[in-house]
Amino acid sequence: MSDRHYDLGMGDHDRLQKELGGGIPRGAIVLIEGDYGAGKSVISQRFSYGLTQEDALVTLISTELDTRGFLDQMHSLEYEMVKPLLNEEFLFIAAEIDSGGSILSGGDDNDRKDLLRRLMEAETLWEADVVIVDTFDAILRNDPKFEALVRQNEERQAALEIIGFFRDV
């Protein structure tokens, strides 16, 4: 790791680190946009693997995969993540969201509906050097408080509060 960037590793495997100017700047908030099926999750998985190979502590929150699905996907990409998981160098959190907007496990009904607050208050996941959320919009779409702000045309204020939180972390 350099003083200014988190190295993405695998320089002999692909050009990602070079194409991104030497890695991910420390303290950066990075947003990856694209259509459904464009490969955003695979890029997140590539970041996770490369960063852990370069000794960064990484948390990946996925609204799309459970732990088994994640490990199978990583294995198919030849990114072995079992050792980093067992060594606590990598934290994978499956945020399984059902069609009703609830996280499927844990908490009472009120907690399960307040997804964004629960994410922000989960201190352990923010202890990593790099935190990746795949897919953040699923959490926002299913959070009633964020949804209420959008209905009141206050989405800009909600976005500023979220960005402010991430900057403080």
Language model regions located:
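The Walker A/P-loop phosphate-binding site
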Residues: M1-L77
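A conditional alpha-helix N-cap/helix-loop micro-motif detector
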Residues: G9-H13, K40-S41, D109-K113, R156-A159
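Generic hydrophobic alpha-helical segments
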Residues: D12, L16, L20, R112-E123, ...
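Conserved inter-motif catalytic segment of the P-loop NTP-binding fold
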Residues: A56-K145, L149
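Substrate-engagement module of ASCE P-loop NTPases
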Residues: R151-V169
